[in-house]
């Protein structure tokens, strides 16, 4: 049986909301420096590969790598773009063979604990002048998530759902500034 607290990634279900998911990633890409000329790009938590493929189109001379923990997502990514190096692994212990010029992490790092250790480690994986581009959603703080938590805690399903709730380990923005400065 699968662990109910561990997210299961279904590429078909994930694709149903592709436009909504892509919006934040595209905004993040648009914030990358215009003069960025990376040789090594890593997309951490690449899922089905759309963002890594866009990064490869934007930087065709770069070696692009996509890292994800889901074999099903990586299978979909490989079908999308065989020229990208797709790697199954865990962001929490990931270390690149070569320093990265761009580490792109859209909606992936909020799943991981211990940002006090994770973020400095990601910065250490960058080449001099490299860019760490991160977007983490704050969905858990919205009203609809509060209603979902309330509903999950009541009714005949409450016992089956106990222990499943997970609050992302996000820090105060000022603390991220301190870690990255």
Regions found by a protein language model. Give the residues of each.
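Conserved catalytic/acceptor-binding region of the Class I
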Residues: 116, 131-181
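Class I SAM-dependent methyltransferase SAM/SAH-binding core
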Residues: 40-94
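Short glycine-centered segments of the SAM/dcSAM-binding site in methyltransferase folds
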Residues: 40, 130-131
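A short SAM/SAH-binding and catalytic strip from SAM-dependent methyltransferases
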Residues: 102-115, 138
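Helix-to-beta-strand junctions that scaffold the AdoMet/dcAdoMet cofactor pocket
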Residues: 112-113, 126-128
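Conserved alpha-helix/loop element of class I SAM-dependent methyltransferases that forms part
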Residues: 20-39, 54
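Class I SAM-dependent methyltransferase Rossmann-like catalytic core
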Residues: 4-21
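A short acidic, Gly/Pro-enriched loop at the edge of an enzyme's catalytic core
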Residues: 95-103
């Amino acid at each position: 049986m699968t662990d109910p607290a561990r997210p299961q990634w279904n590429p078909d279900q994930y694709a149903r909301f592709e436009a909504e998911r892509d919006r934040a990633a595209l905004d993040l890409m648009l914030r990358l420096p215009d003069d960025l000329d990376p040789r090594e790009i890593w997309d951490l938590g690449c899922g089905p590969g759309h963002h890594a493929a866009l990064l490869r189109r934007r930087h065709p001379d770069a070696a692009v790598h996509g890292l994800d923990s889901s074999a099903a997502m990586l299978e979909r990514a490989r079908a999308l773009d065989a020229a990208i190096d797709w790697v199954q692994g865990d962001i929490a212990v990931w270390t690149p063979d070569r320093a990265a010029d761009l580490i792109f992490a859209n909606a992936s790092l909020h799943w991981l604990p211990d940002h006090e250790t994770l973020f400095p480690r990601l910065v250490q994986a960058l080449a001099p002048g490299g860019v760490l581009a991160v977007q983490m959603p704050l969905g858990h703080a919205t009203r609809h998530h509060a209603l979902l938590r309330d509903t999950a805690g009541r009714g005949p399903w409450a016992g089956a759902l106990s222990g499943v709730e997970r609050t992302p380990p996000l820090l105060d923005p000022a603390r991220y500034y301190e870690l990255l400065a």
